[in-house]
Amino acid sequence: MNEDIKIVHLKSKQQRLQTWIAMFNGEIVGHIYMDIEDEQRIKFLDAWVHEDYRRRGIFRALWETRWNFCKKYYEGWLVYAW
């Protein structure tokens, strides 16, 4: 992945939605979401990378960041994609 791309976690204490964005030179070039549900379930939601920044490993970095977050904080929970 390009070293100038930064993955940033946007934390929300009010909602169960977790968001990560990919930034390049201060611009958002991608995002990925997940929803923390009741009964120890996590729903993987939308993921997107701007077409000008595809094929640089950004989607993979977003996906792995989200997955590692789940493994660290929600081990044993059911994770599914929608």
Over which residues does each language-model region extend?
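Conserved acetyl-CoA-binding loop-helix of GNAT-fold acetyltransferases
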Residues: 55-68
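Short beta-strand micro-motifs in enzyme catalytic cores
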Residues: 16-20, 42-45
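Conserved beta-strand in the GNAT
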Residues: 27-35, 41-43, 48
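Polar/charged side chains located within well-ordered beta-strands of beta-rich proteins
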Residues: 9, 19, 32, 63-66, ...
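Conserved N-terminal entry element of GNAT/NAT acetyltransferase domains
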Residues: 1-11
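Conserved GNAT acetyl-CoA-binding A-motif
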Residues: 70-82
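A short, internal acetyl-CoA/4′-phosphopantetheine-binding micro-motif in the GNAT/acyltransferase core
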Residues: 47-55
